[in-house]
Amino acid sequence: MKNIKSKKRVKELGEVFTPPELVNEILDKLPAHVWHPKKTFMEPSCGTGNFLVEIAKRKLSLGHKPQDVAQSLFGIDIMEDNVRECRERLVKLLGDKYASIINENIECRDALK
């Protein structure tokens, strides 16, 4: 995965993607209680879902049900192509059965408005 899609998008939007290795390094530093099944995660600039996908993988590895994982993840991005890719990645990981939850929870809009 590339860290940028285009120089224009970096300049206009400040769009840079966090590589999965760094995402996992950050997630490793979180305390154990954040992985409780009822805890939710909200990513206000989710991009293509690097954080949300890695969070979902961890929750699944802890034995959380895919439906519970889908219901616990929320994301916003201003770019439609990023939102589409984020949704696709989460559906691929969690299953088509949860597409409606994922589509509702991952929104295309400006998180600052």
Feature locations, PLM:
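SAM-dependent methyltransferase catalytic region
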Residues: 1-113
